[in-house]
Amino acid sequence: MFLERLSPIESKIKILEEKLQDTNLIKNQKEYAKVIKEYNYLEKIKEKKDEYENIISQIDENQKILSEEENLEMKELIKQELTHLNLKKDEIEHTIKILLLHQDENDNKNIIIEIRAGTGGEEAALFAHNLYEMYTKYSEKKKWKTELINFNETELGGFKEVSFEIKGKEVFKKLKHESGVHRVQRVPITESNGRLQTSAATVAVLPEVEETDIEINEKDLRIDVYRSSGAGGQHVNTTDSAVRITHLPTGIVVQCQNERSQHKNKDQAMKILRARLYKFEDLKKQEQRSNDRKQQVGSGDRSERIRTYNFPQNRVTEHRANISLYKLEEIMQGELDLLLDTLALKLQEQALKDNPI
């Protein structure tokens, strides 16, 4: 029964209220903020639960009156009231179901985005650069701050790979669904015959992770230093300032060469490594949770095509939600909300189907 799912809410709130009175908790600001967030979240559900129960009570009362009422006019008025109450009940029930879709603890975090050129050679690298510009322009519109961490540029100005940070309110919540393979269809500037080509780039969106959020053993790291290189592979630094870090247990490799100092490059590489390891562990947990439903959550949505950008038709197709918008130019200029808002709604509806409450 729907209300049975909500029954433990009040006892959980009482436990959190007791925790919040603990003076030791207040000293630990990070843990205190976490408990406050959970408390506010449960209070929001309780508020809707109380509202829902009140509506149910009104429906029961009106149905009882209707069964005893003999006046036809009064009966009609009661029926109208019942219709209104049932609509209200459905609305509140839907709101509660959305709230019960577990809130992502990373939603308020800053992010690191990694974009890599896939199939398509130079054209794929140019498209990777286009995606980077799309996200930075979107960030400007949102008043978010972006910072370039690392990039490997081609001779024509494309990116073989690029990593950058975005800081702001609910950045991860807004952009977390961007992870995956982005495909482009257009005539490349390198194509003299004017033939349409399909290329791809891979996007990974990683929540930024504090040092205290994940433990990394120094013994598990192999750190190599080398000279940084620019477009075409030529060396641009006479000192070994570039850093490559390999996490031996997982085989994850991170490199950074864009800062002039080796120390700064190591710090940036460690920041990316923490984010990747956190994502790696999170995907393993998701895979375990989704095995019963036989979903491919844990396989990493980066391995599947999520979106196609067709330049000749000015069309963007979002494959996960079966959305096509003929507004490619606006989207590439950072008007991503045209797509993201509809996508979030579709994915929310799908989540409700996959997790019936």
UniProtKB/Swiss-Prot annotation:
PTM annotation, UniProt: Methylated by PrmC. Methylation increases the termination efficiency of RF1.
Name recorded for this polypeptide: Peptide chain release factor 1
Similarity remark: Belongs to the prokaryotic/mitochondrial release factor family.
Protein role: Peptide chain release factor 1 directs the termination of translation in response to the peptide chain termination codons UAG and UAA.
CC terms in the record's Gene Ontology section: cytoplasm
UniProt feature, compositional bias: Basic and acidic residues: 284-307
Modified sites of kind N5-methylglutamine: Q234
Subcellular location as annotated: Cytoplasm
Disordered: annotated span: 284-313
Family annotation (HAMAP family): Rel_fac_1
